[in-house]
């Protein structure tokens, strides 16, 4: 019996070693592939462009090469750089998630550097977000500067049970505030927190600031992204240029407390033994194989299942629900042949490219009858493109108004999806409004006409058309200007139709532009006509001030344009909001009245915001008395003199105000 035992031992050792070697190799390859960067979101500020042979382009190439070089600070996860002199100076940085390895950080930054030239071609300002890193560059100074606008809210669209909702309401904000306390005491400005969700499941939270922020600015930024994050989802995140917050019920980051897996056992040469002399030795081989093979199969099935569930959980952020109920045949009369569009645009030649939107590129074209058109070619790589394409065709084909861009045709040809609009020669409002060299062309008379035209266009959508339509993405870049500077509302990809008696709708997919979203929509997915009113109010304040809400730099303690305007109004100084380019030649009574209307539109309570019919009346009749505006929405101010996340007590007092839909404890600065 002893001899048989000695002979089984090397066999067991060999098969066990083979098993662990195979498993280790598989896991290693799995981990490497999991480190590929996962794209999340990007923004391109298309108010300033550069040309291929310009000094700015050369400076940008030098900057990106520096950030992605082998000598970059991947081990710390953060690096910034500045290249050139004004006006061609370019400033940039990368910030990797605090838990990723040096190699993962390097790969993500290198990937982002190549990706930005595709996603934001010829744009002087861009921000690209990935799960593993963020890359930013700008022609303005972005270093050590707190920016709390220009981001996005993403929610996990998986279903939430009532029991889970109760647990989430108790866990989300405390967990994120605990993570914030860790981040504020970390050199990387990075913190995580893990709490129990159920007996068998954990809850994970993560927050992070760019390390170049001061502790106070990081605290302020985290306060905003924690208070604004939806608490009624199975997972959610807010990302903006300066900080981020996220929670899930799965481990979406590497838990530093988990020790690394032990190295695989070394494979030693088994001792030479005599060949087996009995059938029992053969049976032992069969027994070993019978044990080892099922274990390998079980492990592989477990890993495959884990990959599937993890990817499905991640994908739920970005996969929209099916677009049911649309009838694209109602627009059949507008369908164009793809070859006709190719001919009109010279086969989409680069010299005809006039813009780039969220779902594709825009080209100028000329039809065979001489009609100039704008051709919107949806990107094949856009996961949302087909939904927005169908939505835009069905909606815009039924709309006819002088302040709405007119759809002339569309094309569905294989993977090609193309929209053909009337050509508007003066591009978009933001092209003039936010450019120091061009904003002078928008005197007060033109700005006032634009405000009125946009109001009439939205009124048509809400009340006067055959359909009640909520635009959901009103902003300066979606207001086109014709040859006479008349405004035309564009981009209906996010729009939704309401029923006859419907006043609001809920959605689990928050879309639009952060900074223009109303509080109830950004935090709870509730949108209505009053959501568009809020966006219109932000737009009015932008038109008056010439300042962009999505990249507003801190002034007198204000973190965004709305709070800045509210502060001036509260102190009796509304004229200080006016763009210096027009302040000497404006009708002051009209300006003050428009500031008043803008602040009425951005009030926190949707019920107190005026309807579009009332707004148009306010703009056209000076005899209408305007009510006193109340506090705007999305305002966060610490009621305690010190940093709001310094202590557990302060954190808890901060959390209570965000649980209610009304956000009653939020105050203007």
From Swiss-Prot:
<feature type="glycosylation site" description="N-linked (GlcNAc...) asparagine">
    <location>
        <position position="185"/>
    </location>
</feature>
<feature type="binding site">
    <location>
        <position position="376"/>
    </location>
    <ligand>
        <name>ATP</name>
    </ligand>
</feature>
<dbReference type="InterPro" id="IPR008271">
    <property type="entry name" value="Ser/Thr_kinase_AS"/>
</dbReference>
<feature type="domain" description="Protein kinase">
    <location>
        <begin position="348"/>
        <end position="634"/>
    </location>
</feature>
<feature type="domain" description="Gnk2-homologous 1">
    <location>
        <begin position="38"/>
        <end position="142"/>
    </location>
</feature>
<comment type="similarity">
    <text>Belongs to the protein kinase superfamily. Ser/Thr protein kinase family. CRK subfamily.</text>
</comment>
<dbReference type="GO" id="GO:0005829">
    <property type="term" value="C:cytosol"/>
</dbReference>
<feature type="glycosylation site" description="N-linked (GlcNAc...) asparagine">
    <location>
        <position position="53"/>
    </location>
</feature>
<feature type="modified residue" description="Phosphoserine">
    <location>
        <position position="477"/>
    </location>
</feature>
<feature type="topological domain" description="Extracellular">
    <location>
        <begin position="35"/>
        <end position="285"/>
    </location>
</feature>
<feature type="modified residue" description="Phosphotyrosine">
    <location>
        <position position="421"/>
    </location>
</feature>
<feature type="glycosylation site" description="N-linked (GlcNAc...) asparagine">
    <location>
        <position position="159"/>
    </location>
</feature>
<keyword id="KW-0677">Repeat</keyword>
<feature type="glycosylation site" description="N-linked (GlcNAc...) asparagine">
    <location>
        <position position="80"/>
    </location>
</feature>
<dbReference type="InterPro" id="IPR002902">
    <property type="entry name" value="GNK2"/>
</dbReference>
<keyword id="KW-1015">Disulfide bond</keyword>
<keyword id="KW-0418">Kinase</keyword>
<keyword id="KW-0597">Phosphoprotein</keyword>
<keyword id="KW-0732">Signal</keyword>
<dbReference type="InterPro" id="IPR038408">
    <property type="entry name" value="GNK2_sf"/>
</dbReference>
<keyword id="KW-0812">Transmembrane</keyword>
<dbReference type="InterPro" id="IPR017441">
    <property type="entry name" value="Protein_kinase_ATP_BS"/>
</dbReference>
<feature type="disulfide bond">
    <location>
        <begin position="209"/>
        <end position="218"/>
    </location>
</feature>
<keyword id="KW-0325">Glycoprotein</keyword>
<dbReference type="InterPro" id="IPR011009">
    <property type="entry name" value="Kinase-like_dom_sf"/>
</dbReference>
<dbReference type="InterPro" id="IPR001245">
    <property type="entry name" value="Ser-Thr/Tyr_kinase_cat_dom"/>
</dbReference>
<feature type="transmembrane region" description="Helical">
    <location>
        <begin position="286"/>
        <end position="306"/>
    </location>
</feature>
<keyword id="KW-0723">Serine/threonine-protein kinase</keyword>
<dbReference type="Pfam" id="PF01657">
    <property type="entry name" value="Stress-antifung"/>
</dbReference>
<keyword id="KW-0808">Transferase</keyword>
<comment type="subunit">
    <text>Interacts with CRKIP1 (KAPP), CRKIP2 and CRKIP3, three kinase-associated type 2C proteins.</text>
</comment>
<feature type="glycosylation site" description="N-linked (GlcNAc...) asparagine">
    <location>
        <position position="49"/>
    </location>
</feature>
<feature type="modified residue" description="Phosphotyrosine">
    <location>
        <position position="521"/>
    </location>
</feature>
<feature type="modified residue" description="Phosphothreonine">
    <location>
        <position position="513"/>
    </location>
</feature>
<dbReference type="GO" id="GO:0016020">
    <property type="term" value="C:membrane"/>
</dbReference>
<dbReference type="Pfam" id="PF22812">
    <property type="entry name" value="CR_prot_dom_plant"/>
</dbReference>
<dbReference type="GO" id="GO:0106310">
    <property type="term" value="F:protein serine kinase activity"/>
</dbReference>
<dbReference type="GO" id="GO:0004674">
    <property type="term" value="F:protein serine/threonine kinase activity"/>
</dbReference>
<feature type="topological domain" description="Cytoplasmic">
    <location>
        <begin position="307"/>
        <end position="669"/>
    </location>
</feature>
<feature type="region of interest" description="Disordered">
    <location>
        <begin position="260"/>
        <end position="280"/>
    </location>
</feature>
<feature type="glycosylation site" description="N-linked (GlcNAc...) asparagine">
    <location>
        <position position="114"/>
    </location>
</feature>
<feature type="disulfide bond">
    <location>
        <begin position="221"/>
        <end position="243"/>
    </location>
</feature>
């Amino acid at each position: 019996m002893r001899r048989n035992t000695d002979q089984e031992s090397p066999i067991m050792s060999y098969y066990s070693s083979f098993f662990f070697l195979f498993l280790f190799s598989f896991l290693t390859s799995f981990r490497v592939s999991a480190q590929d960067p996962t794209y999340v979101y990007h923004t391109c500020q298309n108010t300033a462009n550069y040309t291929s042979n310009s000094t700015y382009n050369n400076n940008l190439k030098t900057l990106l090469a520096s950030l992605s070089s082998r000598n970059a600070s991947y081990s710390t996860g953060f690096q910034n750089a500045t290249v050139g002199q004004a006006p061609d100076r370019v400033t940039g940085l990368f910030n990797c998630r605090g838990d990723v390895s040096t190699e993962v950080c390097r790969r993500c930054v290198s990937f982002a550097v190549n990706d930005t030239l595709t996603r934001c071609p010829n744009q002087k300002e861009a921000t690209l977000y990935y799960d593993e890193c963020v890359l930013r560059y700008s022609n303005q100074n972005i270093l050590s500067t707190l920016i709390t606008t220009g981001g996005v809210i993403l929610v996990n669209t998986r279903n939430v049970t009532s029991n889970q909702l109760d647990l989430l309401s108790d866990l989300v904000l405390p967990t994120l505030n605990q993570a914030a306390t860790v981040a504020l005491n970390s050199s990387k400005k990075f913190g995580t927190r893990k709490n129990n969700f159920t007996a068998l499941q954990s809850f994970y939270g993560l927050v992070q600031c760019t390390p170049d922020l001061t502790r106070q600015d990081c605290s302020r930024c985290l306060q905003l992204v924690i208070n604004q994050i939806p608490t009624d989802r199975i997972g959610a995140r807010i990302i903006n240029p300066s900080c981020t917050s996220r929670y899930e019920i799965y481990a979406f980051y590497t838990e530093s407390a988990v020790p690394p897996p032990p190295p695989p056992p070394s494979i030693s040469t088994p001792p030479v033994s005599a060949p087996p002399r009995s059938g029992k030795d053969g049976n032992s081989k069969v027994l070993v194989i019978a044990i080892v093979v099922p274990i390998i199969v079980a492990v592989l099935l477990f890993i495959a299942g884990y990959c599937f569930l993890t990817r499905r959980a991640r994908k739920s952020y970005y996969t929209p629900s099916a677009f049911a109920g649309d009838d694209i045949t109602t627009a059949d009369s507008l369908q164009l042949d793809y070859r006709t569009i190719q001919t009109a645009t010279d086969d989409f030649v680069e010299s005809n490219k006039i813009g780039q939107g969220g779902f594709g590129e825009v080209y100028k074209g000329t039809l065979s009858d001489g009609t100039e058109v704008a051709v919107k070619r949806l990107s094949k790589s856009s996961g949302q493109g087909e939904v927005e394409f169908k939505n835009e065709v069905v909606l815009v084909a039924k709309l006819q108004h002088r302040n709405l861009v007119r759809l002339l045709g569309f094309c569905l040809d294989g993977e090609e999806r193309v929209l053909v609009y009337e050509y508007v020669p003066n591009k978009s409002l933001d092209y003039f409004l936010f450019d120091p060299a061009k904003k002078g062309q928008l005197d007060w008379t033109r700005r006032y006409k634009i405000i009125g035209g946009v109001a009439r266009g939205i009124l048509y959508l809400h009340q006067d058309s055959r359909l009640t339509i909520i635009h959901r993405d009103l902003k300066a870049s979606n207001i086109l200007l014709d040859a006479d500077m008349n405004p035309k509302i564009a981009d209906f990809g996010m729009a939704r139709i309401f029923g006859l008696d419907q006043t609001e709708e809920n959605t689990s997919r928050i879309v639009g532009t952060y900074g223009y979203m109303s509080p109830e929509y950004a935090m709870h997915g509730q949108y209505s006509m009053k959501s568009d009113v809020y966006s219109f109010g932000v737009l009015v304040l932008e038109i008056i001030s010439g300042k962009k809400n999505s990249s507003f730099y801190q002034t007198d303690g204000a973190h965004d344009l709305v709070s800045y305007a509210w502060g001036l109004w509260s102190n009796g100084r509304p004229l200080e909001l006016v763009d210096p380019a027009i302040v000497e030649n404006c009708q002051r009574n009209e300006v003050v009245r428009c500031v008043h209307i803008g602040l009425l539109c951005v009030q926190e309570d949707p019920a107190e915001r005026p309807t579009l019919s009332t707004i148009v009346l306010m703009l056209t009749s000076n005899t209408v008395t305007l009510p006193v505006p109340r506090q705007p929405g999305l305002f966060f101010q610490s009621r305690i003199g010190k940093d709001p996340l310094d202590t557990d007590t302060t954190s808890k007092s901060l959390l209570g105000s965000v649980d209610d839909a009304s956000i009653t404890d939020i105050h203007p600065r």
